[in-house]
From Swiss-Prot:
The gene is SOR1. NAD(+) binds at D202, K207, V275, G276, M277, C299, F300, R301. The keyword Oxidoreductase applies. It catalyses: keto-D-fructose + NADH + H(+) = D-sorbitol + NAD(+); xylitol + NAD(+) = D-xylulose + NADH + H(+). This is Sorbitol dehydrogenase 1. Belongs to the zinc-containing alcohol dehydrogenase family. SUPFAM superfamilies: GroES-like, NAD(P)-binding Rossmann-fold domains. Homotetramer. It comes from Saccharomyces cerevisiae (strain ATCC 204508 / S288c).
Length: 357
């Protein structure tokens, strides 16, 4: 493709993805960088917008460029840029907060009410040839870390953030409900942080088999447990812990029965982190939360230092993200990539779309 073109993967409307030409972005802020996007992972949120046109309060009202799990190469820098240079390979943190909110000043910029997050309406995403980013939301990829691995840093950062929230350390016994990309990486980070037991729970045997590449010490298939069988599910998981409860439970599925079972699996005084996005409302045993004096913590994306730490985990070999990638597509086949993810959800873990040539 021409250096003077900027092809983009655009969600025109629900169920309609097209490749169209967008203007090549021009650096106007001296602290910004122009990037050539090299690899982008498909996220569940992209699929949700494609199928239904909205997530919560974020509704697709106009065509939007998809993608937010990306890596790229610096091709131009603003006059004030000092952290990166032309030619650097980087992972791109896709959410940029305001520089003035209380949340940002507190170091919790992921909670900034003015966050501009890629591929969250009305903000365009990263599935383009050229993309602009502030320099302080880029993390350089060390030699030996590929662009594909760099694209996996985004979901890995969620795993880093959730483990920090939970305080996982050496000896922690962990259960992860949901062995999708974020669940697998959350468990892998737990092992890297020192957890001695990491049990994955999912409905697909192939995903549980893959969990062994992400630090699983044991797995449990939950496909037979309906919503009213949460206690039975919790009992089954606890047997794998010698009849004990878990110190930390990460709920990464968003499924009602798993949320309920996660509470029941958490020990007295333990911690449950709700990582997965489920329905707006769900039923769970709140009396048990109080009676156990357990911590129930929400988790939203990632914040200061999480991207940096995620890159370091990959670069040092403490977390191997390569087994996460199950499918790869060329840029011009992006629409096929999304349709394939929908049609083969049980076998797909992470799909990578390469940048345009």
């Amino acid at each position: 493709m021409s250096q003077n073109s900027n092809p983009a993967v655009v969600l025109e409307k629900v169920g309609d993805i097209a490749i169209e030409q967008r203007p090549i972005p021009t650096i106007k802020d001296p602290h910004y960088v122009k990037l050539a996007i090299k690899a982008t992972g498909i996220c569940g949120s992209d699929i949700h917008y494609y199928r239904s046109g909205g997530i919560g309060k974020y509704i697709l009202k106009a065509p939007m460029v998809l993608g937010h799990e990306s890596s790229g190469q610096v091709v131009e820098v603003g006059d004030a840029v000092t952290r990166v240079k032309v030619g650097d390979r980087v992972a791109i943190e896709p959410g940029v907060p305001s520089r003035y909110s209380d949340e940002t000043k507190e170091g919790r910029y992921n909670l900034c009410p003015h966050m501009a997050f890629a591929a969250t309406p009305p903000i365009d995403g990263t599935l383009v040839k050229y993309y602009l980013s502030p320099e302080d939301f880029l993390v350089k990829l060390p030699e030996g870390v590929s662009y594909e691995e760099g694209a996996c840093v985004e979901p890995l950062s969620v795993g880093v953030h959730s483990n920090k929230l939970a305080g996982v350390r050496f000896g922690t016994k962990v259960v992860v409900f949901g062995a999708g990309p974020v669940g697998l990486l959350t468990g892998a980070v737990a092992r890297a942080f020192g957890a001695t037991d990491v049990i994955f729970v999912d409905v697909f045997d192939n995903k549980l088999q893959r969990a062994k590449d992400f630090g699983a010490t044991n797995t449990f298939n939950s496909s037979q447990f309906s919503t009213d069988k949460a206690q039975d599910l919790a009992d089954g998981v606890q047997k794998l812990l010698g009849g004990n409860h878990a110190d930390v439970v990460f709920e990464c599925s968003g499924a009602d029965v798993c949320i309920d079972a996660a509470v029941k699996t958490t020990k007295v005084g333990g911690t449950m982190v709700q990582v997965g996005m489920g329905k707006n409302y769900t039923n769970f045993p709140i009396a048990e939360v109080s009676g156990k004096e357990m911590k129930l913590i929400g988790c939203f994306r990632y914040s200061f230092g999480d991207y940096r730490d995620a890159v370091n985990l990959v670069a040092t070999g403490k977390v191997n993200v390569k087994p996460l990638i199950t499918h790869k597509f060329k840029f011009e086949d992006a629409a096929k990539a999304y349709d394939y993810n929908i049609a083969h959800g049980g076998e797909v873990v992470k799909t990578i779309i390469f940048g345009p040539e």
